[in-house]
Amino acid sequence: LKEHTLDELATWFKNHHLKPWAYNTLIFFNQRDEAGEKEIDDEVDFILKVSKAIGMKMLITVPSFDVKDKTISEIKEEAVARLRYLSDKVGEDMKISLEFCGAPNCSINQFGTAYDVVKAVDRPNVGITVDTFHFHEMCSKLEDLKKADGNKIFAYHLNDCEDLPLGSCGDDKRLWPEEGVVDLSLIHI
């Protein structure tokens, strides 16, 4: 929208077969100070404006990194509160999908933790994104995935990973499906 207007973008989508599916991604939605929460609010206001204009119905959000000295319980409790707040802000017509990130310093870095948060939020428009790279990277448990309600999985990112020690890979180590070591056939509902 730096070189074109929102109306031009909306017209383009209206006149083409390609349709927007999700805003990927609202980064670092949790564990923010007051100024950071204001930044998130402003970004969500912008996302909502664009989404309404182009018919986009989902917002994928990523948790914060490097939240020193916070317990898992504290992180979950605060994430639940923030996602409920965001759920109210976007309204029931837009979904929010929490994408856990498979990095040791991510505040929500395993499927089980993310799913616990989504269950506690207990809103029909809040679910989870499963990224097979992140699932593999922090050794998320297949048992947790198998127990999950498939209706709460809103997005699925299909990726593979280089054969490196778990927890050591950044996004630059992503590969196309079946080019790496992730057994993609297992990561499903």
What is each PLM-predicted segment?
Residues 187-189:
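Conserved small/polar residues in nucleotide/adenosyl-binding loops
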Residues 1-8, 66:
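Glycine-rich, proline-tolerant flexible connector loops at the mouths of alpha/beta enzymes
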Residues 21-30:
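N-terminal small/glycine-rich loop or linker at the start of catalytic domains
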Residues 27, 63, 160-162:
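Short, small-residue-rich loop/turn micro-motifs
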Residues 19, 57, 154:
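Short acidic/polar active-site loop segments enriched in Thr and Asp
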Residues 23, 85-181:
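Acidic/histidine-rich catalytic cores of soluble enzymes
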Residues 14-16, 29-127, 137:
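Active-site acidic/histidine proton-transfer and metal-coordination neighborhood
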